[in-house]
């Protein structure tokens, strides 16, 4: 189950986070502004975040296999159709809906499956599973950049459509519904979502998402405008992914022995401080340092989000709870990259846009500080089972 989840997330997010490699070719072909082009990625994130509660509920009710298989077909169709668009706004529909739905169908059901199958070492298993996102990020952008340079962006999307569909269908065939003996929730689903702890998680996640997706869209073009080659620019997104693998696996394993909420807060702090490095990054080596630090914090955030939900609320209906939390990412993503693009277009500089992302990331950490008071009592130490 862990291997299937790892591979599924690698395929889904490898496609989604490769968008930065397609950004400049599409910007040039359609003659659009940065904000309008980046909206294609933002819509993708909004769709996968908004569909999280739906795919989580469907997985809880009907099992993950049919949900993941459906996502495979939808993602493949969306990518294939994107290769044929002649207007940018059509990409909002084909790429935004297709890739967004595919990611939603892969991520939440797979995370819920791993959380349900494991009791002991649950956090380690979750950390390994979501490390697939980082591995996909490592591979996706550089592979896309190399393919685009030889085949063009349209043919590359066709290749991605075929590969992602085949991989996700294989993962769907392997995955099985977890046993029914999951840890029961302390409170009812509606009460959990309305609780102060969940509200803090949600607000913090909105703010961090505003910052998080900015480098995935703009870091390659930022590096290119500062003298880096196309491949070296795209490789920065891969470095973020590589560092996030270490963050996901390392912190996921450490959470089995340390306080999961405090590690979660530390991940947000590291992520926030990394934007200060980017703000002072006129040279490629400093950009690499930013990518490494940001990736480590990002990896901890992604790896520990499911663990924090299980820790605070139990694993009963975990897919639905995670889906509800992940809608926050959609709101943040819809604001972050388009706003950054608008600022860059208006000022002709990345500096103010990076500073705005820095401020949003700091705010996300501040919002998370009170979360420690809501740690569960010792009778249900879910994260340490």
Spans of model-derived segments:
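Extracytoplasmic gate region of multi-pass secondary transporters
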Residues: 19-24, 196-249, 253
């Amino acid at each position: 189950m862990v291997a299937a989840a790892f591979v599924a997330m690698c395929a889904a997010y490898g496609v989604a986070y490769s968008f930065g490699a397609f950004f400049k070719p599409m910007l040039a072909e359609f003659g659009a502004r940065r904000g309008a082009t980046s909206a294609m990625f933002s819509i993708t994130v909004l769709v996968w975040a908004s569909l999280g509660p739906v795919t989580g509920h469907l997985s809880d009710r009907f099992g993950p296999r049919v949900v993941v298989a459906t996502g495979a077909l939808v993602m493949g169709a969306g990518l294939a159709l994107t290769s044929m668009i002649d207007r940018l706004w059509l990409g909002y529909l084909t790429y935004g809906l297709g890739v967004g739905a595919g990611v939603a169908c892969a991520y939440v059901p797979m995370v819920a499956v791993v959380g349900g199958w494991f009791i002991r070492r649950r956090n380690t298993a979750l950390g390994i599973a979501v490390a697939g996102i980082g591995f996909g990020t490592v591979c996706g952008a550089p592979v896309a950049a190399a393919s685009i340079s030889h085949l063009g962006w349209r043919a590359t999307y066709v290749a991605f459509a075929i590969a992602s569909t085949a991989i996700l269908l294989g993962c769907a065939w392997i995955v099985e519904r977890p046993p029914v003996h999951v840890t029961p929730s302390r409170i009812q689903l509606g009460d959990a979502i309305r609780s102060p702890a969940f509200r803090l998680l949600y607000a913090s996640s909105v703010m961090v998402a505003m910052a998080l997706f900015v480098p995935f869209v703009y870091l390659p073009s930022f590096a290119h405008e500062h003298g880096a080659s196309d491949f070296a620019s795209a490789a920065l997104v891969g470095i973020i992914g590589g560092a996030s693998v270490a963050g996901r696996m390392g912190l996921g394993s450490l959470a089995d022995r340390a306080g999961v909420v405090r590690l979660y807060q530390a991940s947000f702090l590291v992520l926030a401080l990394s934007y200060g490095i980017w703000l002072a990054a006129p040279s490629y080596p400093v950009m690499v340092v930013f990518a490494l630090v940001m990736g480590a914090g990002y990896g901890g955030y992604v790896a520990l989000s499911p663990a924090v939900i299980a820790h605070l609320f139990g694993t009963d209906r975990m897919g639905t709870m995670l889906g509800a939390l992940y809608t926050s990412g959609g709101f943040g993503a819809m604001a972050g990259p388009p706003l950054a693009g608008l600022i860059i277009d208006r000022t002709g500089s990345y500096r103010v846009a990076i500073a705005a992302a820095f401020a949003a990331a700091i705010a996300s950490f501040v919002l998370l500080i009170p979360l420690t008071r809501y740690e569960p009592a010792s009778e249900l130490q879910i994260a340490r089972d």
